[in-house]
Amino acid sequence: MDKFRMIFQFLQSNQESFMNGICGIMALASAQMYSAFDFNCPCLPGYNVVYSLGILLTPPLVLFLLGLVMNNNISMLAEEWKRPAGRRAKDPAVLRYMFCSMAQRALIAPVVWVAVTLLDGKCFLCAFCTAVPVATLGNGSLVPGLPAPELARLLARVPCPEIYDGNWLLAREVAVRYLRCISQALGWSFVLLTTLLAFVVRSVRPCFTQVAFLKSKYWSHYIDIERKLFDETCTEHAKAFAKVCIQQFFEAMNHDLELGHTHGVLATATATATATEAVQSPSDRTEEEREKLRGITDQGTMNRLLTSWHKCKPPLRLGQEAPLMSNGWAGGEPRPPRKEVATYFSKV
């Protein structure tokens, strides 16, 4: 158990490395899935293209959505995007940075699937077998005498060697080599293009927008850390709240048993009075528990606190916080907007 706890703590403290590892595992899994997939081209005109496009596009979409779902920050992004502005304005640049960071990792597995599919060539062969230039690669003198539907039917069977019967018009091996050559060229071009794009996004872009990049990165990390600390604080409060409630219940039951009362109205009133005294008495709780409760000792107050946190988060201005009024604004009314001027110096 200690080893698992250490691993879990390491993953929590190194979330970025953990997500990179998950993306790498998904990329390897996508390649393994394709190698284990039984590709069966229908070899029918009109159906080949639909089947091939489905194989080429549907699994990458599923892998992309899985990559987003497995990222813990997707809920944080949705919460930050949909929350009311309140006293803290929402920065679109931070939201874009958060989404781009998640999308870059989630796109790794789909890119691997598309690249492996194109390099293998089966999907491309099935989709474009009817577009082979028969006049150039085969017996072009026989093409004018064939109806278009018959020619399409013959070429659609090129991916299926067991039913292909058009060698008198076009050698199947010639068509397969021709289409696979084009597919592999497209595959390597796709790999090169995505590699260059990733290099530009990860390396070159921050050099031209360094200040904006640093600000977006900082506030993105701040939102993540703030949410984690809020969850930890709520968890500590819930544990302390539950502990005090259980202690009050047992103390009230013990008091009733000592007095010999039943669970009637009088016993309920006595238990309530005892519970109130237990909350207000510092001798029944340790100093740590009182600090975790932070003066919130009933359900209604906690619900109002959570509602206020969602609708009106505190401004990012330390040391100038005033108590909240009923409408969510400090001082009873909104403060007028102030123009802030910031100067950034870069030594790069």
Swiss-Prot record:
Cytoplasmic-side positions: 1-20, 72-98, 206-348
Membrane-spanning intervals of the chain: 21-36, 49-71, 99-124, 180-205
Similarity annotation: Belongs to the CALHM family.
Variant or mutagenesis effect after changing residue 245 to S: Increases channel trafficking to the plasma membrane. Decreases ATP release
Tissue: Specifically expressed in type II taste bud cells (at protein level). Not expressed in brain.
Superkingdom assignment: Eukaryota
Alphabetic keyword roster: Calcium, Calcium channel, Calcium transport, Cell membrane, Disulfide bond, Endoplasmic reticulum, Glycoprotein, Ion channel, Ion transport, Lipoprotein, Membrane, Palmitate, Sensory transduction, Taste, Transmembrane, Transmembrane helix, Transport
Effect the entry attributes to changing residue 207 to S: Has no significant effect on ATP release or channel trafficking to the plasma membrane. Loss of palmitoylation, gain-of-function and high cytotoxicity
Record's protein name: Calcium homeostasis modulator protein 1
Reaction(s) catalysed (UniProt annotation): ATP(in) = ATP(out); Ca(2+)(in) = Ca(2+)(out); Mg(2+)(in) = Mg(2+)(out); Na(+)(in) = Na(+)(out)
Annotated consequence of substituting residue 23 to S: Increases channel trafficking to the plasma membrane and ATP release
Subunit (UniProt): Oligomerizes to form hexamers and octamers. Does not form gap junctions. Associates with CALHM3 as a pore-forming subunit in a hetero-hexameric channel complex.
Residues annotated as glycosylated: 139
GO cellular component, one term: basolateral plasma membrane
Region feature Central pore, mapped onto this chain: 9-36
An example Gene Ontology molecular-function term: calcium-activated cation channel activity
Regulation: Regulated by membrane voltage and extracellular Ca(2+). Inhibited by Gd(3+), ruthenium red, and Zn(2+) and partially inhibited by 2-aminoethoxydiphenyl borate.
Gene: Calhm1
Region forming the signal peptide: none
Organism this protein belongs to: Mus musculus (Mouse)
General function of this protein: Pore-forming subunit of gustatory voltage-gated ion channels required for sensory perception of sweet, bitter and umami tastes. With CALHM3 forms a fast-activating voltage-gated ATP-release channel in type II taste bud cells, ATP acting as a neurotransmitter to activate afferent neural gustatory pathways. Acts both as a voltage-gated and calcium-activated ion channel: mediates neuronal excitability in response to membrane depolarization and low extracellular Ca(2+) concentration.
Record note on domains: A phospholipid-binding pocket is formed between conserved regions of S3 and S4 helices of one subunit and S2 of the adjacent subunit. It may regulate channel assembly and gating.
